[in-house]
């Protein structure tokens, strides 16, 4: 008998929580980027949504959700710089592949008109990978 099942895919995004009070415009920017990323995932998988993580407590909650759902794979979207405490509690003790998704929103920044918030929100994700990979 053939049983149709969907892979359970844990999905979450991370950003450094300290940036958000300093640059409140990042919150809707990051939420929009995370929503857009989730929409790229096919409907042939079951998404277990860990949300946008900016603290170690949120990371732990996402990890608890992933463990309870017994996910098959995790996608982690890097929104901007974040420390390993944003990532590690969510993926520790999971015996599944973890894919770091590091996509810069724009092909190139308009440097003449870029401020700190737009740099952090639209152009810095690629600078965040080193520490994450080292900790994994």
In which residue ranges do the predicted regions lie?
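An N-terminal assembly and electron-transfer interface module characteristic of large anaerobic redox
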Residues: 1-136
